[in-house]
Amino acid sequence: MAISKILNMKDCGGHFHGKHLKRALDYVMNPDKTQDGRLVGAINCQVDTAFEQMKETKRNFGKIDKRQGYHIILSFKENEVNPDTAFEITQKFVEEYLGKSYEAVLVVHDNTAHVHSHIVFNSVSFVDGKKYRYEKGDWAKYIQPITNRLCQEYGLSLIHISEPTRH
């Protein structure tokens, strides 16, 4: 079982655009939480230069302000998955959900009782400059269903998504 959630990172203003994005990348890539960096990967960018590449994409398309990026967390049930399997699941999630359009860093943290993954990705597509658009309901429509399907493929338990009650 893995529960997912998505957070956004806004621009902090001032002269250092992307401060929150940089902090998120630094936090998730902490060697103490990722087996000295063994559980760190990237898609459509290089791990060591991910922040610079993301900023360059924003510059190229004139979108350096406002929303800087997004942070998805996949939290697995305690003792249900090992870090390597969590990494495989996370990598497949990123490939399917973000495709070939967004620069993303993916990591697994194994420093707590439950293994969990972090995905930090650019808000601007390096392919066409379009900003990622998260709509209300996307979690239940796309994010958690992909997570559930991947967990099912690996024999993990699932989160059941209930339809909202209407009055």
Give the residues covered by each predicted segment.
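Short "domain-exit" segments at the C-terminal end of structured domains
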Residues: E163-H167
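N-terminal nicking endonuclease/strand-transfer module with a His-rich metal-binding environment
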Residues: M1-S162
